[in-house]
Every structure is written in structure tokens, then in C-alpha cells.
Amino acid sequence: MNIQLIKNFNPILKINTQSSNIKLNKIIPNEWLFILMNTGSFTQNLNSLLISDININISQKYNYNQPQQFHNTRTVWLANNNNQRFAFAQSRWIIKNNYTNYLNLLNNKPIGKSFIINETDLHKKIEEIYCGHSYILEKNFQSQQLIWGRKYTLLYNKKSFIVIQEYFSPNLTKFLKFH
């Protein structure tokens, strides 16, 4: 299975949202602030913005090597019906003990949708916001503008079990204009 991780993202701005006293609205454009700080389902928001279904291309790699522990790496491209890509996400799951309860969440659906279907209550803790350049992302987004992204942790029962990094196409701002 082809797991494509973004290792060569070159940030020119990186903000730790947990320890920063920076007023984000002073340095991040409103269009991006809306996307980056939203704690809801990005896939659902993208469906609403584009008023069309989003195609999801998922690759996963499982690792059961350690007893009582489960590892999963998952990459996702979100695109419209014309195969225009709007977001790339990579997630790393480390689940200790009783990981079989989580296996039904690992399907070809967006993570948020899986949790909604399984009625799992989560909290999204946004940890970092960044913008920069990446040849791979610029090629896939068909844009050489700055790429914004974020890193967050999903918490279940106040415990971290999934870390997600998302990178967003600069073309998204065409659908979000705040004046």
C-alpha cells in the first residue's frame, strides 16, 4: 500500500497554539483562521462550501507488532468530482489496550464521520498552525501560493489517541471571502 507522508514541508511560520499569546487574527487572514481554528468536521465543512460531494482517497498501514498496542498510519486526499484536491491529511494512531474497539473506526470514511456514526464523543485540541511550501503539496494542489496547515490531537476520555496533520489548498480561499 502506498502511504505518502509529507516530510518536506518547509514552514515559514509555525505557531504553537497551546503556549502562544499571539493574537492569531493579527497574523492569519480571516479566511484561513476560519478553516484552521474550526473544531468541527473539515470534510463536512468542505461539502457545504463546495455544495457537492467530496471524494476521499485513503491509504492505511497497520502495525500490530507490539502486544496490547495498535499502530495505524493513514493518509487522505480530499478532492471534488473533477479531482481538484483541496486538502491532504495524515494521521497517526497509537492505541494501547483493547484496540479492537477502535477497529470499526478504521474504514474508508473520514475520521469524523466514523466517530459520528459510532456515537463517539471526542475533543479536538489544535496544537500548531503553520504555513509554508512543499513541492509535493504545491504540485497536487496546482498552486505555488503559501500552504496553510494545522496539527491537532483527538482526545477520547481526556486521553490522546490520534494525531492529525492537515494541509489545505490555497484554492480554498476562493470559496471563503470575508469583507
From Swiss-Prot:
Coiled-coil regions listed: none
Annotated keywords: Chloroplast, Plastid
Pfam families: Rv2949c-like
Assigned GO CC terms: chloroplast
Subcellular location: Plastid, Chloroplast
The organism's place on the tree of life at top rank: Eukaryota
InterPro entries named in the record: Chorismate_lyase_/UTRA_dom_sf (IPR028978), Rv2949c-like (IPR002800)
Similarity field: Belongs to the ycf21 family.
Protein's name according to its UniProt entry: Uncharacterized protein ycf21
UniProt lineage: Eukaryota, Rhodophyta, Florideophyceae, Rhodymeniophycidae, Ceramiales
